[in-house]
């Protein structure tokens, strides 16, 4: 069963109770989901203005869902609601970092790259040490001082 995470930003100029009501309305769309958690992250400043708004209420949904139609419905409703400034829906099991950690072919490739990086780093350090020793062994002329 795919695990999803949704970040929701609701307009910060409305009252907190209305923002919570918007989040709860959207939560009701996901009623077929299991292990549904709604975390309120509070009122925060936005990194840049969105629709001339500089603050927003952040909400985080975590849940498991088998029905992709409910995800599409959630997306459709958030686009229609004027109070919702932004939303981001992430399927955590399709996350490429997760796949890279579990795919054996990618694990072997990353180990090879790490070993190659280590060898190159050792060679560079050896060359730098050799140059430093040569510099220390050269005689100093009195005219150089």
Swiss-Prot record:
Coiled coil: none annotated. Disulfide bonds: none annotated. It comes from the Bacteria. Pfam families: Ribosomal_S6 (PF01250). Keywords: Ribonucleoprotein, Ribosomal protein, RNA-binding, rRNA-binding. PROSITE patterns: RIBOSOMAL_S6. One of its GO terms (biological process) is translation. One of its GO terms (cellular component) is cytoplasm. InterPro entries: Ribosomal_bS6, Ribosomal_bS6_CS, Ribosomal_bS6_sf, Ribosomal_S6_plastid/chlpt, Transl_elong_EF1B/ribsomal_bS6. Gene3D superfamilies: 3.30.70.60. GO terms for molecular function: small ribosomal subunit rRNA binding; structural constituent of ribosome. CDD domains: bS6 (cd00473). Belongs to the bacterial ribosomal protein bS6 family. Binds together with bS18 to 16S ribosomal RNA. This is Small ribosomal subunit protein bS6.
